[in-house]
Amino acid sequence: MTHTRRTFVSAVTVGAVGLSGCIGDGDDPPEDEPDDDEPDEYDFEDQPEDASPTFESPEDGATVQSPVEFVVSVEEADLIPAGENEVGAGHLHILVDHDVFDRGETIPGPSDSAEEDGIYHWSDAQTEDSLELEPGEYTIAVQLGDGAHIAFGETDEITITVEE
């Protein structure tokens, strides 16, 4: 190869290598545009205050047998599994003979000790489930919590009597 040809090939090779470093593969979004794959940042303060769970069954004052089947509807919020945080969404907690939690308070559990204290988590975004309760009178509340079990929205409360 002649000296001129070698110089030309070297110059073309160096130029091609340098140019390839300037061209992206198209997978990365431009720096000034948001990546659509990244979720929006979650801010608890944006959770709706008017989100409202309501007992559909049993009715307030009902006499029932164990296991007690609870059915709940929810307005102004969506239900999503525990562990996921999304504004306008959460999961339900059933409180048996337990005070409701103030907005922003962490609802304990899920754990055996929380259930011993009357706090039951419906962590799978369900709207119905059953509980084994001994005979007696109970005050039952339902409350929304976000993915980290932080209480928000309104609550509903019923009183039931469980018979043998």
Q: Where in this protein do the model-derived segments appear?
A:
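Conserved aromatic beta-strand anchor motif in extracellular beta-sandwich/beta-rich domains
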Residues: 94-96
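Terminal disorder- and signal-encoded targeting elements
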Residues: 1-89, 98-164
